[in-house]
Amino acid sequence: MTDAMPPDDVRVVVYGKPGCHLCDDAYAVVEQVCAAVGAGWRAVQIQDDPELMARYGEQIPVTFVDGRQHDFWRVDADRLRAALA
């Protein structure tokens, strides 16, 4: 997978990998905000995709909203909520 275009019901995609504490923090924020606004989200584990690792490995977690890069390293709940409004 090389693009961030989500299925119709998923507006937020978070690229991360296991063992990444910033990813765990991002998943928690994204889950909370998406639940509050009724938006779907999913996590994409990049460790098995060399292209994604090369592109995003130093920036994870990387958050996309509606197919466009929104944040990396940390997710600001207010900024994410505004992007989903």
Could you tell me what each predicted segment is?
Residues 48-62:
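Short Fe-S-cluster ligation motifs
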Residues 39-50:
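Thiol-based oxidoreductase modules, predominantly thioredoxin-like and allied folds used
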